[in-house]
Design a protein with these regions (language model features):
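N-terminal helix-turn-helix DNA-binding module of bacterial transcription factors
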Residues: 1-60, 76
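Short, solvent-exposed amphipathic alpha-helices that sit
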Residues: 35, 73-87, 162-166, 188-207, ...
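Amphipathic helical "hinge" segments at domain boundaries
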Residues: 45-118, 195-198
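Short beta-strand elements in bilobed, periplasmic/extracellular small-molecule ligand-binding domains
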Residues: 85-96, 180, 198-220
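Flexible loop/hinge segments that line or gate small-molecule binding clefts
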Residues: 99, 121-165, 186, 245, ...
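Hydrophobic alpha-helical segments within soluble ligand-binding/sensing domains
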Residues: 155-180, 192-199, 219-227, 247, ...
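An alpha-beta-alpha
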Residues: 166-206, 211, 313-331
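Flexible loop/turn connectors
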Residues: 223, 227-337
Length: 337
C-alpha cells in the first residue's frame, strides 16, 4: 500500500509538505504542488480517508438508517438524502433494519464506531431509549418521517392534518361510512393519521364506529383482512388507507369481493408513490414530498455537523413539517350527484 512517505520520497519533499499540497487548504509553492501531484499520480496514491477524517475531526460520511428499503417510500427518501449529501461532499452509508428495533440499535452502535459524522434515522420501533442515548452522545441526529419527540431534530409531515383533510374530502363528496385501514398504532405516524381520521369524522358530526377502524401491523396482511371484513358486513362508502401499499391491497380486495372502485367503494391512500397514477383506477392519495424530505434531512444534519447554527434559536431542536397535498384521481367519486 502506497503511503504519504512514499509520495514524499518520490517528490523529494517532506511528508508534511505532501499533506499540505494535497489538502489544498494551506499555501504551497505551485512548483512544489505540481511535483507532489505528479508523484501521487505516478504511485496511484489514495489518501486514507479514515485517518484523514480522524485528524480533522470528520470523515465526510453520514449514516442513514431506514426500517424497510422494500417499502417504496424509502428509496425516494434515500435518494433525496444521498443527492443532497453528495452536493456537500458527503458519502451516505445506508442501513436497513427490517423494522427490527434490535437491528436498529446494532446499526447505531456500528455507525458510531465507524466515526460517521451524523445519523439520519427513520426509526423502526416504538422504543426511544436508544435514540435518547444517541442524541445525548453529542453525535448529530435527525429523525426522518417517523419522529418521536420534539427535542430531537426531525423532518416529517403533519400526519394528523393530512388525514383529516382526506376524510373531510370523502365526507364532502357524500361518503359517510368510512373505514380506516391503518398500520401499527405503536408508531407515531400511524397514531397521528388515526387521530386525523377521528377529527375528520368529529368535525362533520359523524359518530366514530370502532368496527370501521382496522389496525393491520403487517402490510402483507392487508388484503386478507379487508376481504374478511367485506365478507362479514355491508359494504362501506369508502376506505381510507394509511399508506399507498395498503391502498393497493385494499383495491384488490374490494374488486375480488365483487365491488367496484369507485362506483361502490371509494379508496384513498397516503404517500402518492410513483405507481399511484398508474393503478386501475388511478389512486386518490395524500402526497408526501418524499424526495424533498430526504433532502431537507440531509441539509439539517450537515448544518449540525458543520456547526452552521450560531444562535441558541438555531441550535434548538428543529422539527421541519413539510406540506402535503391531496391528489384527487379516479379511485374516489362524488356520491352527492
Amino acid at each position: 500500500m502506497v503511503t504519504i512517505k512514499d509520495v514524499a520520497r518520490v517528490a523529494g519533499v517532506s511528508a508534511s509538505t505532501v499533506s499540505r499540497a494535497l489538502s489544498g487548504r494551506i499555501p504551497v509553492e505551485e512548483s512544489t504542488r505540481e511535483k507532489v501531484l505528479e508523484a501521487a499520480k505516478k504511485l496511484n496514491y489514495q489518501p486514507n480517508a479514515l485517518a484523514k477524517g480522524l485528524k480533522e475531526g470528520r470523515t465526510g460520511t453520514i449514516g442513514l438508517i431506514v426500517p424497510n428499503i422494500c417499502n417504496p417510500v424509502f428509496p425516494l427518501v434515500s435518494r433525496g438524502v444521498e443527492d443532497t449529501a453528495r452536493k456537500f461532499g458527503y458519502t451516505v452509508i445506508l442501513c436497513n433494519t427490517d423494522e427490527d428495533v434490535n437491528i436498529e440499535r446494532e446499526y447505531i452502535q456500528k455507525l458510531r464506531k465507524k466515526w460517521v459524522d451524523g445519523i439520519i434515522l427513520a426509526t423502526s420501533g416504538k422504543e426511544s431509549g436508544h435514540i435518547t442515548e444517541l442524541t445525548e452522545s453529542g453525535l448529530p441526529v435527525v429523525l426522518l418521517i417517523r419522529r418521536l419527540e420534539d427535542r430531537v431534530d426531525a423532518v416529517a409531515v403533519d400526519n394528523n392534518e393530512a388525514a383529516r383533510q382526506a376524510v373531510a374530502y370523502l365526507i364532502r363528496t357524500g361518503h359517510r361510512k368510512i373505514v380506516m385501514v391503518n398500520g401499527d398504532q405503536g408508531l407515531t405516524l400511524y397514531r397521528e393519521r388515526f387521530q386525523g381520521y377521528l377529527r375528520g369524522l368529529r368535525e362533520s358530526g359523524i359518530l366514530f364506529d370502532p368496527s370501521l377502524a382496522l389496525e393491520i401491523p403487517e402490510v402483507q396482511n392487508c388484503y386478507e383482512t379487508v376481504r374478511e371484513f367485506l365478507a362479514a358486513r355491508p359494504a362501506p362508502d369508502a376506505v381510507f388507507a394509511a399508506s399507498d401499499p395498503m391502498a393497493l391491497q385494499v383495491m384488490r380486495a374490494v374488486k375480488d369481493a365483487g365491488y367496484r372502485v369507485p362506483d361502490d367503494i371509494s379508496v384513498i391512500g397516503f404517500d402518492d408513490l410513483e405507481s399511484a397514477p398508474f393503478l386501475d383506477p388511478p389512486l386518490t392519495t395524500v402526497r408526501q414530498p418524499l424526495y424533498q424530505m430526504g433532502a431537507a434531512a440531509a441539509e439539517r444534519i450537515i448544518s449540525q455537523i458543520e456547526g452552521k447554527a450560531s444562535t441558541p434559536e438555531e441550535r434548538a431542536p428543529l422539527v421541519r413539517v413539510m406540506e402535503t397535498e391531496l391528489i384527487v384521481r379516479q379511485s374516489t367519486r362524488d356520491r352527492t350527484d
